[in-house]
Amino acid sequence: MKSTTNDNNAKYYIKITKDGPYLVYGISNINQEIIVPDDDGESWIYEKGKKFACQSNPTALCRCGHSNEKPFCDGSHSKVQWNPKETASKENVLNNSTVAKSDTFTLYDNQELCSYARFCDAYGGVWSLVKHNSHNANNGVIEHEIAHCPSGRLMLYNNKEGYFYEPKFDPSISLIEDSIIKISGPLWVKGGIRIESSDGTNYEIRNRVTLCRCGKSKNKPFCDSSHIFSNFNDHLMKEEKEKIKTEMLIEEEVYQ
């Protein structure tokens, strides 16, 4: 799959330190992206949450999962037991993908990259939607589900027009928060940001990437859904809810 980076993205990159945090260059803010369900309870949209200003360049982001200053590093990685070793492949993600086809689309699925955001489950699942896409009736839903797959596990090729469908993202980094199952998810890296390994080599540059921040992934630096099984919670959602509640109480007092 063709790289989604360009010369304008050169100032943005992430350096993985060997036993420590992610060093993030060129990013001014880290935003929460909160998974919100549709009427059937399936993941459907992201809602913007709290914004965290990066005070330095580079900014160190926690990847061990133990910082008390999340999303930022506070040095906890040197005081706790965790395995920082990178084990993920640097191959093209298409190489390890399964394939589902229809006349219009080919869906590539690299399951190793799954971050369990579950946008692919709505309306019977994106695999079924692709296979049974008569008269292109499902095109909009298929593209929506692909665009909201944060890890890039799912990649959609348009057979008739000869291109991979990708949403347009500016370079940015977000914190995924799952309001449905009350779990904190990975770092969502968007817009073709280069990710440099601790050994100095680069991972494949992609438009949609999720990086582990719970410290438990067995496919580091990428998320492998381990935050689900470890019940990872950064407690930032709770802080945001308490802030909103306080603001509402203040407004009530003003108007009384």
PLM regions: where:
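Short gly/acidic/polar-rich coil/turn motifs that serve as flexible hinges in modular proteins
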Residues: 65-67, 215-217
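Short cysteine/histidine-rich metal-coordination sites, predominantly Zn2+-binding motifs
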Residues: 77-94, 130-143, 162-170, 227-244
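Ferredoxin-like iron-sulfur electron-transfer modules
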Residues: 47-63, 95-116, 126-147, 159-165, ...
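C-terminal functional regions that serve as terminal interaction/effector modules
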Residues: 193, 209-213, 219, 225-229, ...
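Intrinsically disordered, low-complexity linkers and tails
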Residues: 1-40, 50-56, 93-95, 103-104, ...
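Iron-sulfur cluster-binding cysteine motifs and their immediate structural context
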Residues: 70-81, 115-133, 144-161, 220-231
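Short, structured motif recognition centered on aromatic/hydrophobic residues
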Residues: 22-24, 59-62, 71-73, 121, ...
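Short Fe-S-cluster ligation motifs
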Residues: 16, 26, 91-121, 140-162, ...
